[in-house]
């Protein structure tokens, strides 16, 4: 949970009341925050202004600054209405070049026109950017933001990807001009290691660097590292251009919405933002940014009441939701449905359960019925289907006297490929961009490395060693927005003086029998219904030649059979790579086919 420090008296002034420490602690608890510390006593000794340190939910990005905290608490206390965020007419453009697809493909922008900041609001503006960078932006790897004095630069603005040597500018708080490659060297120096140097790894290996320039080709920023000294903002800046670059479009839009909604209150026309026309013709992403259109989500009144043990009317639930910045009206077609209007400041609302939770907060957790009055509320959790399948694998394996192990999901690149006699073509495993140690370089694509490392650490135990694991592996997929996906696997190994292939095949048979999947002889030709069989397969070099097989599965009558796993006798070279001086057989199956 992020911790936000706010000026105590400033917050109480915004709330219109001076709370005691206990009163404010109770208010935070009721709202869903936690007061971590009140520095009043320390401040009296040092002569500084007292601060409150608040623990915020990780998905409530609108609460990462004093502006958002005070606005949300005032709405919760019914002292203020939800702001109506508006857009004025655009006056400039951000043109995105196709070359940016090589490194950070998404960009967006907005203008805070005629803004008036003081020392405290300016500090809050900078602090919010730091909090967003550290949390939602994943230390600038997903999203980076820059702010510029619009009066010092001229639009339209261009977002390009250029070779490092072609980029020249004076970076923020410096007096010397650098090229892109020289700037990387500068920020990798020991003096900058804990500052901007923390983000150098994001772009340093790329042949091109992202850069935002104005109409006169003056560099505004080199995301995700540094802004230009030329466009530096100050407390006296009246017009601020906000630029966002990202590898994730959704998160980029969230960051822009949070920054603009939180600080547009200081504009001459409060809560009004000047949009920027985003021109991105190469990928069809041209649009006006930001987008302040509210989302509408439908939720069942019965669902909310059943979860909370209440019998609230539509108006009563709407009143609770209003305290949490959500406006709701009852559907005219279906009286059980509420149309909930979700503002751009609440990207954390993703499902009806989020609305139900806010209704509970608005109603008051301490006011919820207790004891016998909860007869219509069900608190027994329902397992996800894949977890239910995983538990079946665990029970069946344990009944067969195998012991479950829980290795780490990360492993070294060699353990995932070279040690298993496999090659890496670059499109299979997710690699960590900046691994702390050589032992944690990639996310595993098979359960075998972790199991073999477990066997290695327990090789002094009596033989045979029979262990299994049910866990996730991860594969890259460029077709998906997140570029990767999880897949639940089950795997088991038999380690002894003999390979024990017949034993591992027997375990596979028990697992399949547990899932009502019968063995089909003659490579699946003996029957046309649901079942499984194995076929010899020498393509997996992890196994001894002629001792590897693929597991084939037909889910139902007439269905096309498909490979769901593999088994075999592990190659002696694989065993020696993991310092295990015994023979072994291994089986691994995709558990998701049984959903």
From Swiss-Prot:
Transmembrane segments: none annotated. It is an enzyme of class 6 (ligase). Pfam families: B3_4, B5, PhetRS_B1, tRNA_synthFbeta. Residues 292-370 form the B5 domain. GO terms for biological process: phenylalanyl-tRNA aminoacylation. It catalyses: tRNA(Phe) + L-phenylalanine + ATP = L-phenylalanyl-tRNA(Phe) + AMP + diphosphate + H(+). Gene3D superfamilies: 3.30.56.10, Bira Bifunctional Protein, Domain 2 (3.30.930.10), Phenylalanyl-trna Synthetase, Chain B, domain 3 (3.50.40.10). It is found in: Cytoplasm. It comes from the Eukaryota. Signal peptide: none annotated. Mg(2+) binds at residues 348, 354, 357-358. Its EC number is 6.1.1.20. Residues 86-90 are annotated as: 3'-CCA residue in tRNA. Its main location: cytoplasm. One of its GO terms (cellular component) is phenylalanine-tRNA ligase complex. Its cofactor is Mg(2+). GO terms for molecular function: ATP binding; magnesium ion binding; phenylalanine-tRNA ligase activity; sequence-specific mRNA binding. Keywords: Aminoacyl-tRNA synthetase, ATP-binding, Cytoplasm, Ligase, Magnesium, Metal-binding, Nucleotide-binding, Protein biosynthesis. Belongs to the phenylalanyl-tRNA synthetase beta subunit family. Type 2 subfamily. Present with 5440 molecules/cell in log phase SD medium. Tetramer of two alpha and two beta subunits. This is Phenylalanine--tRNA ligase beta subunit. It comes from Saccharomyces cerevisiae (strain ATCC 204508 / S288c). The lineage of its organism: Eukaryota, Fungi, Dikarya, Ascomycota, Saccharomycotina.
């Amino acid at each position: 949970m992020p911790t936000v420090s706010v000026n105590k008296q400033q917050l109480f002034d915004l709330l219109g009341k001076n709370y005691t420490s206990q009163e404010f602690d109770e208010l935070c608890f009721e709202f869903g925050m936690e007061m971590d510390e009140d520095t009043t006593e320390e401040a009296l000794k040092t002569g500084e202004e007292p601060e409150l340190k608040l623990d915020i939910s990780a998905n409530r990005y609108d609460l990462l600054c004093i502006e958002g905290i005070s606005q949300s608490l005032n709405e919760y206390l019914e002292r203020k209405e939800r702001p109506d965020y508006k857009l004025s007419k655009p006056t400039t453009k951000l043109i995105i070049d196709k070359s940016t697809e090589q490194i950070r493909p998404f960009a967006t922008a907005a203008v805070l026109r005629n803004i008036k900041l003081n020392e405290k609001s300016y500090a809050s503006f900078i602090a919010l950017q730091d909090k967003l960078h550290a949390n939602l932006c994943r230390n600038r790897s997903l999203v980076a933001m820059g702010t510029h004095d619009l009066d010092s630069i001229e639009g339209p603005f261009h977002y390009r990807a250029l070779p490092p040597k072609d980029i020249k500018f004076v970076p923020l708080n410096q007096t010397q001009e650098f090229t892109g490659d020289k700037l990387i060297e500068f920020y990798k120096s020991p003096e900058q290691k804990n500052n901007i140097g923390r983000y150098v790894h994001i772009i340093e290996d790329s042949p091109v660097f992202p850069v935002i320039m104005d109409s006169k080709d003056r560099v505004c920023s080199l995301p995700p590292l540094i802004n230009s000294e030329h466009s530096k903002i100050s407390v006296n800046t009246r017009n601020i251009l906000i630029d966002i670059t990202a590898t994730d479009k959704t998160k980029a839009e969230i960051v822009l919405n949070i920054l603009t909604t939180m600080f547009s209150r200081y504009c001459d026309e409060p809560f009004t933002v000047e949009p920027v026309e985003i021109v991105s013709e190469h990928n069809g992403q041209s649009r006006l940014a930001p987008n302040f259109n509210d989302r509408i989500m439908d939720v069942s009144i019965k669902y909310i009441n059943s979860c909370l043990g209440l019998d609230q009317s539509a108006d009563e639930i709407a009143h609770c939701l209003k305290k949490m910045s959500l406006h709701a009206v009852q559907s005219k077609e279906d009286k059980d449905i509420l149309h909930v209007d979700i503002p751009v400041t609440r990207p954390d609302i993703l499902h009806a359960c989020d609305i139900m939770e806010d209704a509970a907060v608005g109603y008051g957790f301490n006011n919820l019925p207790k004891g016998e009055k909860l007869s219509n509320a069900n608190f027994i959790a329902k397992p996800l289907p894949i977890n239910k399948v995983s538990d079946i694998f665990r029970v069946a394996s344990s009944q067969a006297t195998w012991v479950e192990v829980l290795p780490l999901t990360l492993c070294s690149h060699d353990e995932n490929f070279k040690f298993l006699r496999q090659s890496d073509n670059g499109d299979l495993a997710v690699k960590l961009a900046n691994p702390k140690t050589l032992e944690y370089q990639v996310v595993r694509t098979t359960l075998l490395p972790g199991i073999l490392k477990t066997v290695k650490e327990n090789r002094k135990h009596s033989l045979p060693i029979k262990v299994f694991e049910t866990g996730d592996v991860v594969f890259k997929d460029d077709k998906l927005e997140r570029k990767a996906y999880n897949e639940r696997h089950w795997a088991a190994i038999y380690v002894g003086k003999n390979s024990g292939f017949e034993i591992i095949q027997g375990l596979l048979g028990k697992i399949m029998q547990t899932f009502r999947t019968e063995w089909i002889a003659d490579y699946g030709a003996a029957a046309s219904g649901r079942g499984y069989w194995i076929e010899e397969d020498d393509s997996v070099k992890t196994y001894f030649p002629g001792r590897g097989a693929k597991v084939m599965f037909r889910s139902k009558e007439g269905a096309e059979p498909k490979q769901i796993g593999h088994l075999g006798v592990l190659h002696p070279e694989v065993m020696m790579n993991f310092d295990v001086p015994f023979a072994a057989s291994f089986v691994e199956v995709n558990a998701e086919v049984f959903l």
